[in-house]
Amino acid sequence: MGSVKRKSVEESSDSAPPQKVQREDDSTQIINEELVGCVHDVSFPENYVPLAPSVHNKPPAKDFPFTLDSFQSEAIKCLDNGESVMVSAHTSAGKTVVASYAIAMSLKENQRVIYTSPIKALSNQKYRDFKEEFSDVGLMTGDVTIDPNASCLVMTTEILRSMQYKGSEIMREVAWIIFDEVHYMRDSERGVVWEESIVMAPKNSRFVFLSATVPNAKEFADWVAKVHQQPCHIVYTDYRPTPLQHYVFPAGGNGLYLVVDEKSKFHEDSFQKSLNALVPTNESDKKRDNGKFQKGLVIGKLGEESDIFKLVKMIIQRQYDPVILFSFSKKECEALAMQMSKMVLNSDDEKDAVETIFASAIDMLSDDDKKLPQVSNILPILKRGIGVHHSGLLPILKEVIEILFQEGLIKCLFATETFSIGLNMPAKTVVFTNVRKFDGDKFRWLSSGEYIQMSGRAGRRGIDKRGICILMVDEKMEPAVAKSMLKGSADSLNSAFHLSYNMLLNQLRCEEGDPENLLRNSFFQFQADRAIPDLEKQIKSLEEERDSLVIEEEESLKNYYNLILQYKSLKKDIREIVFTPKYCLPFLLPNRAVCLDCTNDDEEPQSFSIEDQDTWGVIMKFNKVKSLSEDDDSRRPEDANYTVDVLTRCMVSKDGVGKKKVKAVPIKERGEPVVVTVPLSQIKSLSSAIMNIPKDLVPLEARENALKKVSELLSRHPDGIPLDPEVDMKIKSSSYKKTVRRLEALENLFEKHKIAKSPLITEKLKVLQMKEELIAKIKSLKKTVRSSTALAFKDELKARKRVLRRLGYITSDNVVELKGKVACEISSAEELTLTELMFSGIFKDAKVEELVSLLSCFVWRERLPDAAKPREELDLLFIQLQDTARRVAEVQLDCKVEIDVESFVQSFRPDIMEAVYAWAKGSKFYEVMEIARVFEGSLIRAIRRMEEVLQQLIVAAKSIGETQLEAKLEEAVSKIKRDIVFAASLYL
């Protein structure tokens, strides 16, 4: 892949040469008061001979009323040369200028241009902006179609892909395709749509890719150049038009601490001062939310101001507004906004302006919808200059809040991180109410990429000299963690490609479609191929390291090592049987002495003894646990139901992020007597001894005395007088007896093994283990190389084709059948289950309202713990859906597609069936909300998505001549498409 790199600094300039600043990541940033530089690179396909740059005498397609930045003028030169370009720059840097020029150029040349964005809200905004500027502009989002024959079409990426598969006439005419927010390609669910669209784009079209800063922009451009056999330029800038200052606001404190200045220098002394200013909150004063301490909102005692109130007050006093305060939950967003109830930020004139704009916006709503609690409750806080923005809001309210924010009538906006995507709404200040977030699996620190994306909203170009970012910190944080978050690099643009049945069927149905070709040309395959030389280098290095480890009597030692592993595995099996709740619960009595395993595999080196390290303690009680802890990865599903509180000897320390860490240690070692909660799997044995210890164990002396009694027991009986599983606990399990016999046989082998008494055996075993680990790494890397050199997803592709043949979607010759034609049209829901239901006759037999209710299970993904069971007729339909889903999943499993059958079946949720049924029956939205008990915006999004699915089913029914079903589905659309749920966007 050819590459030419040049700095975009005009040599003819009379200005002083730009100053280079070496940053911590070794990259060079060019800074100059008059001219700020960028890196311009270009990727060529193999064997491509670049043409000499043409000299343009023709006037520019568009003039701008301001001086262009270097990166903008460099990108525009590429467009004038008729070549594709990727522009990678920070939020609010001015990437839209390049898109605007591409549109102007296309319209001037009478060419077709398509602008795509990841979200409908952004498409609506861009449509309004481009319509005002160019007039010949249309919009296609799935919800709305306006002037589809316009020369410039604004659409979502999903609509573009759909047009490509259908062989739309527009695709044959398009000269330029603009992909905005192309870094969305790494999204695990929707990112694949970008890859498909780019691969399938017409070969004679050119591209404009607009992206946030990504470190591997060159790799992406290399891929585009290879797939489309055309040059692709990269114009990359790290420059922020408005530099940022980063502050810490410690919980309970009163001041701001500058930790990173506008020159990106990290002030460690200031950071430490901010942590020292943290006011520790008493356990009783901490506000809890589902057992977790809420972040970012330390509530003062009665009469005191909360931290959030103090901070916003300070921001307003220092004229740092407008401010966006990011939170990671919809409920917390609203709770924080409510803490501002006494704060008034707008003048009387501004309040009147808010009321006028708000009244005008909701004028299209019915009188009933105007009385919705969310509508009536939000106006008072908006008038005070405070707003809330999250996905649970009614879409019309989200838009009116965006408009008020743009007009400067909202000074303080509480928003979730979705506000940082695409929408051009910068503020002077951005506040992070929390620096930790729950990612669906565990609580973790924000990544540098997430921080960069959200902090990019700070600083308004041409208005603010600098933008301000404030982190609210309420727990100790290591400087290294803070530095990596505040000064780390952006997230790489990595492929999230995955196969789907809809993709596969559309590829087989297309005249020029070829699933293998799509896989071969995917960014995923490109990245896999790229990694091979580096992997081979790693393998060679590891093989050299492996060969350098020479061990005496290696085979005999390996045999002994394997015996140790077998022994430990059998001991573990025995413990799992003995400590299943049905056997052990009757014996988990308070004050019983208990032996615990205190070997920690994550921290301790591998033990080569057949005995693990253990400690002793006293049982306090056992607990029934409802579900796995959100942030405890060590707890295993099989013992998730019970934990045991044990008083034992512990080492108490702080971990890398300042959190208290408690680890059980052998009872004779130094440490504190602490009550810890352990899973059943950590218990090694139960003693028959019940200790006589005081009830009040709060005093340290009482706890020390309790452990002293355990030590006295062990001095008399070193094994602690364990309960015998068979005699005392009455375990009659045949698998237990069988495992015990195998363990005894192994113990005999240990005694007889010739190497057991060999000198330095532990050191030899350590070397052997190192060698075994190297062998395992080499094997894993070789497997990766083999799978990389083969076509990615090749086995999965074969398996999915088997599924489609088994279910009757394609013939043995890969010709798409009737069922397959239906599934081709369904891209907004699980296509196989929906098609199977359609062909089973359920859609024909069900009433229209029941059909709509059933479809809600395909679009609702949130799990509502207190959702009521739907009425009998709806529940019967849901059971049929589950049966169909199970059958589809089991066929996939039989055909070797990796799938968890139960998880797949459980992914269809009945939680809003009743609410949607009521909506289809004609109920008012406020009545439906009383049934649903979810955020209004979440329900509206689900119903709109459902309408999308219905439209796809209408096209599917039409394609197979099912006119009766088509009419029924159209009736379903007419029943749900009304009132506030489908209120028109304010941007249109």
From Swiss-Prot:
Keyword annotations: ATP-binding, Helicase, Hydrolase, Nucleotide-binding, Nucleus, RNA-binding, rRNA processing, rRNA-binding
Family named by the database record: Belongs to the DExH box helicase family. SKI2 subfamily.
Organism: Arabidopsis thaliana
Example of a GO cellular component annotation carried by this entry: nucleolus
Iron listed as a keyword: no
Catalytic activity: ATP + H2O = ADP + phosphate + H(+)
Annotated ATP binding sites: 89-96
Coiled-coil parts of chain: none
Observed effect of gene inactivation: Slower embryogenesis and several developmental defects including aberrant vein patterning, pointed first and second leaves, smaller rosettes and shorter roots.
Motif annotated as DEVH box, chain positions: 180-183
Protein's UniProt name: DExH-box ATP-dependent RNA helicase DExH9
Gene behind this protein: MTR4
SMART domains assigned to the protein according to its UniProt record, in alphabetical order: DEXDc, DSHCT, HELICc
Domain Helicase C-terminal: 307-509
Annotated segments matching region Disordered: 1-27
